[in-house]
Amino acid sequence: MKSITVQQLHEQSDVPLVDVREVDEFTAGHVPGAVNIPLSTLGDNLDALPDGAFNVICQLGGRSARAVQALEARGYDATNVEGGTGEWVSAGFAVEQ
């Protein structure tokens, strides 16, 4: 499974980001530009995933890692963001609400 750090994510601007947290978590604060597709609904929303490579984030990295493993098994080019949104916030990066 491919992974990147929040610092590497911060340096990227051209790779789509899918946030697999639940809607209430996402609306409380998320990485700017992220699209919310909760892990609990991911299987029903595969058509909403970006074409090509994309990153996947959650709060700490566990849910996104599970999502990436499942998506890779289906042929998607997904990369896990280690540390998740919690690490993003701890690094002092901006969030959207």
Spans of model-derived segments:
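Rhodanese-like catalytic fold shared by cysteine-dependent sulfurtransferases
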Residues: 1-16, 20-55, 60-97
